[in-house]
């Protein structure tokens, strides 16, 4: 009988992560959860910014329902201040929840998550720490930043239309396609932005978008209260 823990770690590419970043290790965690601790080193650069060779002490927390739940990451060496893109409890703000979910849906690999989400964040701080501009840009605080990121995902310029698009994404395809497109074109969605919305809905499911509308903690709607006023980094690929 296949050990379910070993099978889970194989699906997540846990061994590949620990083999590539040899100073990371698994540490004790509550049953069903996983915790990775240690030092991660990297060498990376982006166009217009210098190559950075650096290392950080981090902790990565994987919930029992990973990859449905986004991993939580801390820098534990006392180097990154609370004022730099942090969530509650000192977790790193790696990007918008929807952007991170899209990455995890494509692959449950924790190696992929570290290289696409964690290292770009650490690289950005290394640049910022020495007076440079953030290489991947940043989002505004609170709900506005989440709308800005969604506008980027949807390929639209008007972030005020985002809430309407999310409502359409929370519906079934057939129902949504019969309704007016949220872009203001006066065309029904089925003749306008349907391809991009269908791709997002197929990736994350309409329940994900319904949760953005219904949960105050998601801080997505214009009038939702914000319990954490942080700024998110935008994510991008870079050479390493």
Where are these regions (language model features)?
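N-terminal membrane-targeting/insertion segments
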Residues: 1-8
């Amino acid at each position: 009988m296949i050990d379910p823990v070993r099978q889970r770690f194989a699906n997540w590419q846990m061994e590949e992560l620990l083999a590539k970043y040899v100073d990371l290790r698994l540490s004790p965690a509550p049953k069903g959860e996983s915790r990775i601790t240690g030092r991660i080193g990297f060498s990376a650069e982006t166009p217009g910014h210098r190559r950075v060779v650096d290392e950080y002490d981090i902790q990565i927390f994987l919930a029992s329902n990973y990859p449905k739940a986004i991993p939580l990451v801390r820098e534990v060496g006392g180097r990154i201040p609370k004022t730099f893109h942090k969530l509650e409890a000192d977790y790193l703000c790696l990007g918008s929840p929807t952007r991170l979910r899209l990455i995890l849906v494509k692959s449950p690999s924790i190696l992929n998550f570290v290289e696409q989400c964690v290292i770009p964040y650490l690289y950005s701080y290394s640049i910022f720490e020495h007076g440079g501009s953030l290489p991947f840009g940043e989002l505004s605080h609170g709900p506005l930043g989440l709308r800005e990121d969604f506008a980027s995902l949807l390929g639209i310029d008007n972030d005020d239309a985002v809430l309407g698009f999310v409502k359409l994404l929370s519906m079934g395809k057939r129902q949504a396609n019969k309704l007016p497109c949220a872009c203001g074109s006066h065309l029904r969605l089925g003749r306008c932005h349907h391809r991009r919305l269908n791709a997002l809905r197929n990736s994350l499911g309409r329940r994900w978008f319904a949760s953005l509308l219904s949960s105050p903690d998601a801080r997505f709607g214009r009038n939702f209260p914000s319990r954490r006023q942080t700024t998110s980094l935008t994510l991008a690929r870079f050479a390493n």
